[in-house]
């Protein structure tokens, strides 16, 4: 959606994207503080007086201290590189009109449990909360995310809200612009994933896409190790075939 990137791509593969609203540079919007004010507050917390002091700091220490201070880096609507909120840009057709393959993983939220609200004590309390929040749409919500398995339903809501809705919007926008558009859901689960209740977690498709499945040294220390031999998904070769 950035005008500066116009003409840079002739096709796109988008994995587990998120088009949520971002902070705008100089003013508060969508219940988010201005990005500049976030920076000012972070500098105060870290006791940094100038940009030069921040640039001179040890990068890892700066990252660690920022994280401990509750700072979460994200995009900024700066009016130049990212001129508008992403959802607004897609809805108004202000994006690269290229063929697109976009998707998300069925277990995206399993590594984002900290984003879930506290689980209600009973299924009845869950249903009451949904009816109070969603009104006339509550029954449709409960049909998709029932109370009989609250944890799985809450994980699914987070997945669909953050990743599924964003992906669908992108694919529909590309299709409406007359471009080939495909949506996938990656739901593969191997034994090491299942043992840790992480089936199809966020980014678990990446080793398959880039062909590093058979190289255990390429994974972070806590990554569930996949079996050595697997066929690669077809989108690995899509950039060659179009």
What is the predicted function of each stretch?
Residues 6, 11, 15-129, 152-176, ...:
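Substrate-access "cap/lid" subdomains that shape
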Residues 1-5:
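Short glycine-enriched nucleophile-adjacent loop
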Residues 55, 74-77, 141-146, 185-187:
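Short coil/turn segments at secondary-structure boundaries
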Residues 95-142, 190, 204-210, 224-235, ...:
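C-terminal, loop-rich substrate-recognition/catalytic regions characterized by aromatic stacking residues
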Residues 22-30, 86-87, 147-161, 192-196, ...:
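Active-site rim elements
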Residues 14-20, 146-150, 186, 214-215:
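Short acidic (Asp/Glu) and glycine-rich catalytic loops that position anionic groups and cofactors
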């Amino acid at each position: 959606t950035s005008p500066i990137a116009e003409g840079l791509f002739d096709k796109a593969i988008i994995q587990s994207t998120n088009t949520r609203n971002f902070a705008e540079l100089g003013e508060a919007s969508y219940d988010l503080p201005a990005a500049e004010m976030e920076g000012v507050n972070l500098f105060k917390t870290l006791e940094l007086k100038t940009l030069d002091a921040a640039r001179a700091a040890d990068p890892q220490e700066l990252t660690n201290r920022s994280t401990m201070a509750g700072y979460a880096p994200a995009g900024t609507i700066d009016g130049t590189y990212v001129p508008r909120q992403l959802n607004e840009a897609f809805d108004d057709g202000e994006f690269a009109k290229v063929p697109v393959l976009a998707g998300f993983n069925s277990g995206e939220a399993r590594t984002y449990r900290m984003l879930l609200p506290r689980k209600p004590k009973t299924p009845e309390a869950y249903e009451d909360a949904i009816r109070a929040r969603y009104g006339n749409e509550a029954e449709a919500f409960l049909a998709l995310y029932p109370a009989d398995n609250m944890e799985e339903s809450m994980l699914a809501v987070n997945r669909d809200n953050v990743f599924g809705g964003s992906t669908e919007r992108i694919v529909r926008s590309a299709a409406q612009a007359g471009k080939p558009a495909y949506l996938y859901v990656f739901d593969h689960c191997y034994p090491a994933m299942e043992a840790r209740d992480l089936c199809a977690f966020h980014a678990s498709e990446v080793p398959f896409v880039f062909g590093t499945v058979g190289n255990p040294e390429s994974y972070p220390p806590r990554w569930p190790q996949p079996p050595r031999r697997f066929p690669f998904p077809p989108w690995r070769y899509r950039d060659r075939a179009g």
